[in-house]
């Protein structure tokens, strides 16, 4: 094979590897964020207390569930 064909094959392989790696990393990050949201009930409790509210545990859990629900809805909307 000529040198030009080898160079072309190397460029194609590197490009395919780059795009494959980006795709796999993106899917793993989406899965991780979906399973373990960055905002925890403790963080919600702290934010509410900083805003001067005295939140009940039911209010914190309701807010947390709404955030998780919105996160999952955004993930499924993005997959379409």
Curated annotation (Swiss-Prot):
Topology of the protein relative to the lipid bilayer: Single-pass membrane protein
Annotated transmembrane regions: 4-24
A Pfam cross-reference name: UPF0154
InterPro entries hit by this protein: UPF0154 (IPR005359)
Entry's localization field: Cell membrane
Keywords: Cell membrane, Membrane, Transmembrane, Transmembrane helix
GO cellular component, one term: plasma membrane
Protein name: UPF0154 protein Sez_1648
Organism the protein comes from: Streptococcus equi subsp. zooepidemicus (strain MGCS10565)
